[in-house]
């Protein structure tokens, strides 16, 4: 099948009147941060080529990338992909994931929704995540880990760890290469650091108690800050 992907500025070209052959699949994209930019109209849904989606849970590029941790909020993935399916985006789903391990849970959620959306809907995203944690770490540890994971996703939804100092990789003025350009007060920054430190301590405690074959799984699938990763 042939596919047309109106990514970034190409969507503006499409909206300006670009004609795409009817048999070509239209693959709609998110904004690189989890929000789909265009849902097909009735006319686009009736096309022979059908509709697909190209969705990010990891992104390299401007204005800010996020590659370090798997911080894409599962509830946002669930909401956007459910809406995509309901709006007729059903032929092809592609996930931009970058490093697979940090986003292993988001990948599983995305693929399970692509395979059987109704089953995931009936289960609910929280129960789906719970099943993942129980399978990988056992019931008792899942009881302790799920609140940690949910709080980490909540914090990252407000502002991802990679965005705390921004990604001015080509900035010539050195004063902008540090956190001084973050529009938060000192109190907000300290509260954020304390919240992540608390999460990190909880994850590290579980990590030390895990059998060797499960340590890497927790290390890479928990959206935890850097100091926990030093414990290796």
Predicted regions and their residues:
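Single conserved hydrophobic/aromatic residue that forms the stacking wall/gate
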Residues: 220, 225-231
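Basic side chains
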Residues: 2, 192, 229-230
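Long amphipathic alpha-helices with heptad-repeat character
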Residues: 189, 193-196, 200-203, 210
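Gly/Pro-rich turn-and-neighbor structural signature
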Residues: 1-48, 215
